[in-house]
């Protein structure tokens, strides 16, 4: 029911030319200690309880954006979990909108980028430098591979 209601709201709002942002993806159960919570959940419960509503909205209403939660799921930061943001959200469900992290949620900007986090807030100078260094290393590796060394 939640997914149906949310899909109807997203569709109605976006029909008027206004983008929507679903939050807090996923397993966000509490605002207290939200940056330290590690939700332990089985794959079945994750899919049938925590992700089902989001999946319904993504497939039915195509929201413009989605915000990840602060918490961890089974030890993985949601904002850096490739399986949740890339494999399930983008690849399996076909989400083609913008994925944004909650303010300061990204601990590892490279992993977040691999997981298809499109907007990291805020992007600190140290995070930008870290990303630049990682990109430099990838370019060097690609160059070496292309020349066969």
Task: Locate the predicted segments by residue.
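Glycoside hydrolase catalytic-domain context in secreted enzymes
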Residues: 1-149
């Amino acid at each position: 029911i939640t997914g149906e209601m949310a899909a109807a709201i997203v569709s109605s709002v976006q029909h008027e030319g206004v983008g929507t942002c679903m939050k807090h993806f996923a397993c966000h159960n509490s605002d207290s200690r939200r940056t330290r919570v590690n939700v332990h959940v089985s794959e079945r419960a994750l899919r049938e309880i925590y992700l089902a509503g989001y999946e319904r909205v993504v497939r039915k209403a195509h929201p413009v954006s989605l915000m990840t939660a602060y918490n961890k799921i089974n030890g993985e930061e949601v904002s850096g979990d490739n399986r949740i943001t890339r494999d399930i959200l983008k690849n399996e469900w076909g989400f083609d909108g913008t994925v944004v992290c909650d303010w300061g949620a990204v601990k590892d900007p490279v992993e977040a980028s691999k997981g298809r986090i499109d907007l990291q807030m805020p992007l600190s100078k140290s995070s930008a430098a870290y990303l630049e260094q990682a990109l430099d290393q990838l370019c060097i590796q690609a160059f070496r591979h292309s020349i066969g060394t």
